[in-house]
Swiss-Prot record:
GO terms for molecular function: imidazolonepropionase activity; metal ion binding. Fe(3+) binds at H261, D335. The lineage of its organism: Eukaryota, Metazoa, Chordata, Craniata, Vertebrata. Belongs to the metallo-dependent hydrolases superfamily. HutI family. Pathway: Amino-acid degradation; L-histidine degradation into L-glutamate; N-formimidoyl-L-glutamate from L-histidine: step 3/3. It comes from Danio rerio (Zebrafish). This is Probable imidazolonepropionase. The gene is amdhd1. Binds 1 zinc or iron ion per subunit. Zn(2+) binds at H261, D335. Its cofactor is Zn(2+); Fe(3+).
């Protein structure tokens, strides 16, 4: 391939949102308010799928005069943003829980639904009986919908098996999707999502540490699986702090990043535990303490906040402002699962602004570079900088903020989604403002 030949030139964008200026791996405090944005700019992607140049349109045109491009897109009147990163999802399951929505609207709490045989255990029963082919088809459909909403990198958890064979089945499904779809995937083993029926917490912990994790390590070493992270639901009535520590440490010892559910329904001191263990990320944190926030800021453990959860369960939202002001690396995720059925990171950003008092720049940073950091991918994803993967979202609007501002409007705003310089979604139904 000629050194003067490139896969894609996107030129003349009204706004090109780089997010980062100097290769930052995450943004905190005032950095999140001052995102790097170029006016009338272009971005160039090579045949290897990586960004080769970004800058003012006239400078790029002059610098690459005579170059050949497989595709040229004139983005006049449009805005270009980095592909969005969804840092927390549960997308592999069978059996929706639409019937439980009525229970919640009538006042049932999450744990009341759980104790009545609903919630996670309902989904576990259906997922155990579903074929691998059924689960893969459903996962592919869900990931396609996420891509159409601008997500180009997503964390995908297991956790609706709670026994070795089904957890491995779910991880195989995630691995198959990784190989067959363009969207980037970070795979998380979440066998400690709940205590299986008929077992105690102690028995479940022993099974995970002595049986499940060694098998997953073996399958990963042989190339049959690719698992990146380990997760535990650290919660009253689920896995306590001692069991959580045991499972997370075992996962860390086999090379997995710690990325777990903590301080969601009760203050469990999960934030302290995560900071102590060197966790990459802790999700939820609705009940985090002041000391926990300080500990996370010091340890550079990212807080993956999930406004959809507080919204659907009518919980007090996470204290995003306190975390931001303390210097915590704040990221966002959709928490897509049968309980919180949301594919859309633009809607998550809007909810984060309204419910958690984040600004629009903070929400975008939390859905790009900081979410990538939570998945240990901020060296390759989360901003539009030379050397990073060429993942773009292009919207039909004069300012990038419309992607956050127009609640539920992303389907008419997003014109193109691009991954590694390839068009993975082209929307001919965009409407002018």
């Amino acid at each position: 391939m000629s050194a003067n030949s490139f896969k894609l030139l996107v030129k003349n964008a009204t706004q090109l949102v780089l997010v980062c200026r100097n290769g930052e791996k995450y943004l905190t405090r005032d950095e999140m308010q001052a995102l790097a944005v170029l006016e009338n700019a272009s971005v160039l992607i090579g045949h290897d799928g990586l960004i080769k140049a970004v800058g003012p349109a006239d400078v790029i045109e002059t610098q690459f005069e005579g170059a050949k491009f497989d595709n040229v897109l004139d983005a006049s009147g449009m805005c270009v943003l980095p592909g969005l990163v969804d840092a927390h999802t549960h997308p592999v399951w069978a059996g929706d829980r639409v019937h439980e929505f009525a229970m919640k609207l009538a006042g049932a709490t999450y744990m009341e639904v759980h104790e009545a045989g609903g919630g996670i255990h309902f989904t576990v029963a259906h997922t155990r009986s579903a074929s691998e082919q059924h689960l893969l088809a459903a996962l592919k459909s869900r990931l396609e919908r996420m891509m159409r909403a601008g997500t180009t990198l997503v964390e995908c958890k297991s956790g609706y098996g709670l026994e070795l064979d089904i957890e491995v089945k779910m991880l195989r499904v995630i691995n198959s999707a990784r190989k067959s779809l363009p969207i980037g995937i970070s795979a998380t083993y979440c066998g400690a999502h709940a205590v299986p029926k008929g077992k105690t917490m102690e028995e479940a912990t022993k099974d995970i540490v002595a049986v499940q994790l060694p098998k997953i390590k073996h399958l990963s070493a042989s190339g049959d699986l690719q698992v990146d992270n380990i997760d535990v639901f650290c919660e009253k009535g689920v896995f306590d702090l001692t069991s959580t520590r045991c499972i997370l440490q075992a996962g860390k010892d086999m090379g997995l990043n710690i990325n777990f559910h903590g301080d969601e329904l009760h203050p469990m001191n999960s934030a302290h535990l995560g900071a102590e263990l060197g966790a990459l990320a802790i999700s939820h944190l609705e009940e985090v303490t002041d000391d926990g926030i300080v500990a996370m800021a010091k340890s550079k453990t990212s807080a993956v906040l999930l406004p959809t959860t507080a919204y659907i369960l009518r919980l007090t939202p996470p204290r995003a402002r306190d975390m931001l002001d303390a210097g915590v690396i704040v990221a966002l995720g959709s928490d897509f699962n049968p309980n919180a059925y949301c594919f859309s990171m633009p809607m998550v950003m809007h909810l984060a602004c309204v419910m958690m008092k984040m600004s629009m720049p903070e929400a975008l940073a939390a859905s790009t570079i900081n979410a990538a950091y939570a998945l240990n991918r901020s060296q390759t994803h989360g901003s539009l900088e030379v050397g990073k993967q060429g993942d773009l979202v292009i919207i039909n609007a004069p300012r990038w903020e419309h992607l956050v501002y127009q609640f539920g409007g992303h389907q008419e705003l997003i014109r193109y989604v691009i991954i590694k310089g390839d068009f993975v979604y082209e929307n001919d139904k965009v409407l002018n403002l």
